[in-house]
Amino acid sequence: MIDVTRHTVLIGAAAGFGEIDATGPAQAAPPLGGMEPLNSTDGVFTPSKGWGIQKFSFSNPEPSIQFAGLLFAFEVISFENNFGIDPLAVTIERRIDRVRMAGTRLRWAGGQESKAGLVSAELRLTAAGAIEWAVEAAIDAPIKAIKTIVRGLPRGRISLAAEAWCDFGDDEQVFEYPALGGGMATPLAVVEGHDKRFWGISALQTEVRPARFAFLAGPDGYKTELVYEPGAWERPQAATTCKWRIVAAPDFASVAKTHFDWVAKSWQLPDFQQRSDAPDWMKKLALVLSLHGQHWTGYVHNDFDQQLEILRWTAKQIDPRNVMVFLNGWDGRYYWDYPRFEVGARTGGEVAFARLVRKAKTLGYRIAVMFGSNVARRNDPDFPKIADARLRDGNGDFFPANYVDWDGDRKGDGFMVFMNLAVASWRNHLRERIASIVSRFAIDAYFLDICGLWENNCDGDMLVGTRQLVDELAQRFPGVAPIAEMQYDAQMGFIPMSHVPRYSLYPQANFGVVASFNHLSFPAPGGGSTGIHEYGFGRYHPVILDQPQIPTITFVDDTFTTQREAVMSDIATAKQRFAARGGRT
């Protein structure tokens, strides 16, 4: 009898894809205190028909309430166990446009055991037709995460963070905002249903916290798990999630606009042309020259004198006042010599570096210099002074950084470790190294490598630490601008330029707020070398007239000597693009 009820409920939810209806058809009251007796294997392929994620090896109870054509269940997760709602200890209040659920006992061990605890949620239908809710939970142990389980969303291809569509078929997938590996630059997932409606799922955040989106395929739709984590450094025994939103629309742009309107308001994102933290020159860039110096192995692509020769030649092709020079590999062996951030000897030393910057600025160029925002070599002699800032995850374990094969042994190397800008020792060290280079050499901008890494951890909010670093440098060096790599939405409010544009399906959310240029690894003309970057080689793409990001030319060892015609062609196209944009970035 229960299996029939579950199947009927799931089919009914699937049939409600076309609209969000708060009332729904008249139905018999569900059993168990007004909740549907579903479990974790209901509505999903078990075992998975495609690639599967890890999950419980039994049917874990997921008692669910119906609202607006969808089914919702809730769990609270401590650092020791998973707890679901006891449906016999629940009160449910329904109104025409909302439902409130409050549970006073929790079940664990697959429903075999119970304990005291509170979980409550209010789901409401907004005037615009969206479902919004937040979940409150309280238990007698630190809360690790709070999960909402949604059934009834259609299957279809998925866009994550307004990036390219992917059809995952029967594969189960998990994505996270704003994690480093495969992370989302904004907490938005959109499903294009078979009815051609677009279903947007947003985490409406006012502080950066992990938001995970899991999609488990079934015959009639997705079971979608939405996971929120409070700050692991807080270890709260009572927590409230961010607000979640589900909205359906006839086109992707409508869903994206709704989400990014919230993002702009929440993080106070300015219009790029009006930004006070973007200097005037940054708003009038036609070109970025990415000049590669010393590789991890010690191989030098271009020393400082060669870089100056490149800049002198380029100044005859384009007005240097509209060109930013991005200096990377200037500080010794790339990554190996982090976090000293001192001028490398093999590329020419301080005298040659000072000459390069001075003469480049005399020509009219603007100079940006690369720093690692959260990477250090653990066997550096000075590492003990900053060792307390080594990044630990929410469980207290060191966050791994051994994913790059630097030395060619076909295995990731472990000499580098991730650091946490929320910790004063690292933030102060990095601030003083940036300040030293900026003040001594009159640098115009500083680039923060891997700035977009945010990990829930035991020591503090990495966004807050990053913003504090930027604010302190702005006070000391007005007009010297920060540049972010892997930028996520919240950082756009205080960092005006990024290294790779975001939101390709809704580009105005990026280019209306920040300027962007191509990545350090953007392949050079000719053989496609990525210079000091570990990728090695890629396919070179010439500059095109309608590209939204600032044209970027990578100079490696042979670019200036063998690829000058390709460079000249790219510069000519960049000038045409700049003119067509009215002299604006």
Residue ranges with predicted function:
Residues 135-137, 147-150, 327-329, 369-373, ...:
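Glycine-rich, histidine-containing beta strand-loop boundary motifs that form or position
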Residues 331-337, 374-379, 453-457, 489-493, ...:
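Flexible loop/turn segments at secondary-structure boundaries
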Residues 418-492:
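Active-site neighborhood of glycoside hydrolase catalytic domains
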Residues 1-16:
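N-terminal secretory signal peptides and thylakoid transit peptides that target proteins
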Residues 31-324, 335, 359, 363-367:
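Carbohydrate-recognition beta-sandwich/jelly-roll modules
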Residues 286-431, 441:
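Aromatic-lined carbohydrate-binding/catalytic grooves of carbohydrate-active enzymes
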Residues 3-4, 20-35:
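C-terminal segment of N-terminal export signals and the immediately downstream linker at the start
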Residues 382-425, 474-585:
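Glycan-recognition surfaces
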